[in-house]
Amino acid sequence: MITTVVGSYPATPREPETLRERISSFIGSYDACRPAIETAVRDQVRAGVDIISDGQVRGDMVGHFAEAMGGMMVKDGVSIIFSRITPPAGSIGSDDLIYAIKILRKLTDDESKGVKGIITGPSTMAHASKIEGFYSPQKRERAIMDMADALRVEAEHLQDAGALMIQIDEPFLSTGMVDMGTARRAVKRISGALDVDVSLHVCGDISGVIGELLTFPVDMLDLEFAGRPSNLEVLAEKWRGDKKLGFGCVDTSTEVVESTDTIKNLIERGADIAGEDNLYIDPDCGMRKLPREAAFSKLRNMVKAASEF
């Protein structure tokens, strides 16, 4: 079974320590997030994960994109749409992705391992932002589709930078706040432009949306099951077998480290529904809020459990 992560990892930016780093800081070229990316990559590789991330160390999933998009800004921690949304002047995440790949290749020569590119989805970006201009707060469809066009450009940048796959994070899809038809069209704007596999990550209770999620034009649905075991029953009723399933099997909302047997038992239930060959094994969600040791231990046990199939 292939193992992966959802994205974020508890690796914090670091102030310059060495003489070279202090000189770089003095001339304005030191990047405090580079050491955090290296920590995230090293931990994921050490745990044995197949498809890793750069750790998403540069801030929250909405603000990081809003700061770069045309027509958007972040003020007092709030993402704001003030004009028409347009693509950023350059790629938001390609440099970090390339650096993560560089570190990965230093650590292993296994070409089957790679780094995923991650974008926050258009519906989540639009619904998590305050609209102050150009679009109607009551009717966000136009904002969502313009967001999709801008994010498509970023996804293409990530693909060109060497991403093994692209993940679209859409946590808002399980909330009931989103028009699913618009969300589907927006995702298609992105996935239809890519050659690599595309995964759609949706956390939360999927009981009200699983039927529609299964119609989204993506190669994989990534869902949480450790923290929400009821999602297994929902999936069993609707699963059609035409996609891969990102199977969240460690709970990222608690520091408690699941045993290998606990994880393995959950994976077995998922395999009974979707088939072993269709499962990609990963955590429920991002791991940013966990202590680093807990995050690493969860990944290590997850990989060990997956290896027993």
UniProtKB/Swiss-Prot annotation:
Q: Which domain of life is it from?
A: Archaea
Q: What does this protein do?
A: Catalyzes the transfer of a methyl group to L-homocysteine resulting in methionine formation. Can use methylcobalamin and methylcobinamide as methyl donors, but methylcobalamin is not considered to be the physiological substrate. It was proposed that, in vivo, a so-far-unidentified enzyme catalyzes methyltransfer from 5-methyltetrahydromethanopterin (5-CH3-H4MPT) to a corrinoid protein, and that the MetE gene product catalyzes the further transfer to L-homocysteine. Is not active with L-cysteine, coenzyme M, coenzyme B, glutathione or dithiothreitol as substrate.
Q: What cofactor(s) does the depicted protein rely on?
A: Zn(2+)
Organism, as annotated: Methanothermobacter marburgensis (strain ATCC BAA-927 / DSM 2133 / JCM 14651 / NBRC 100331 / OCM 82 / Marburg) (Methanobacterium thermoautotrophicum)
Q: What is its EC number?
A: 2.1.1.-
Q: What family does this belong to?
A: Belongs to the archaeal MetE family.
How activity varies with pH is as follows: Optimum pH is 7.0-8.0.
**What does this protein's record comment on cofactor binding?**
Binds 1 zinc ion per subunit.
For this UniProt record, the keywords arranged alphabetically read as follows: Amino-acid biosynthesis, Metal-binding, Methionine biosynthesis, Methyltransferase, Transferase, Zinc
Q: How is its activity regulated?
A: Is activated by phosphates.
Keyword Methyltransferase carried by entry: yes
Pathway(s) it belongs to:
Amino-acid biosynthesis; L-methionine biosynthesis via de novo pathway
Biological process per Gene Ontology, one example term: methionine biosynthetic process
Protein name (Swiss-Prot/TrEMBL): Methionine synthase
Q: Which annotated residues bind Zn(2+)?
A: H201, C203, E224, C285
Temperature influence on activity is noted as: Optimum temperature is 65 degrees Celsius. At this temperature, the enzyme is rapidly inactivated.
Q: Which Pfam families match?
A: Meth_synt_2 (PF01717)
Among the GO molecular function terms of this UniProt record, one is: 5-methyltetrahydropteroyltriglutamate-homocysteine S-methyltransferase activity
